[in-house]
Amino acid sequence: MPSAEDKLKPGAAVSGRETQRLQTRQRVYAAALAEFKRTGMAAADVRDIAAAAGVARGTFYFHFPTKEHVLAEFERLEEARLVAQLAKSVAQLEARCGPPSSSGPEFLTAALNEVVRLLTAMERRVGKTLFREMLGLHFSPRRPDVLPGADQWAAYPIMTILVEAVGRARERGEVYAGADALHTAQLFMVGLYAMLIASHEYPKAMRAEILDNFMATILRGVQAR
């Protein structure tokens, strides 16, 4: 089903009324994100969001049943952007990596480092507060049904890419033969999100050290011996 963003793209066939509805939805969405950046989602007041968008309070709920639904839409769009970049990067990485060596899992290290790079770049682009709110939604009991549940990590496109990357690393002999690709990818993503949330206010050098140690732990756990 096309998203609201897709329907607003040039060339999309929509009626005048539908265009107006989508434009109103986009104003509400943009106003909500701006307020989330300013105060955090929990403290954001729907009345302030509606006023900033120039609509009635009820109009917010017409388009988004809860504030979490705004964040879910943001996550969906940002993940689509990240997945497109990651898929392109991972496709190039194995070609750049030479044959497996005794020095360690070169391809898998590069692939996981690319995930970290893309996520931290996203954090700089959208701001720490909104980024933290987005990651926190993965662990929230109020997570909207429009997103996969907390126990459905395999349903995320980014997980599909990571599972394939772990599988290719296993075929290259970088990862031990019994390593489960899905569980390895899930452990990495859950741990990475938790680390990024917990360390978002840390000094840059300290955070980099924490992420490096986390990465080393994951890689040591699956490295072929």
Tell me what each language-model feature is.
Residues 1-12, 114-121, 159-172, 186-225:
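C-terminal peripheral helix-coil segments that are non-catalytic and often amphipathic
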Residues 1-23, 94-97:
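N-terminal intrinsically disordered/low-complexity leader segments
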Residues 20, 24-32, 49, 74-78, ...:
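Generic hydrophobic, amphipathic alpha-helix propensity
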Residues 24, 78, 82, 112-115, ...:
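Hydrophobic/aromatic residues within well-ordered alpha-helical segments
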Residues 27, 35-69, 73, 77:
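Helix-turn-helix
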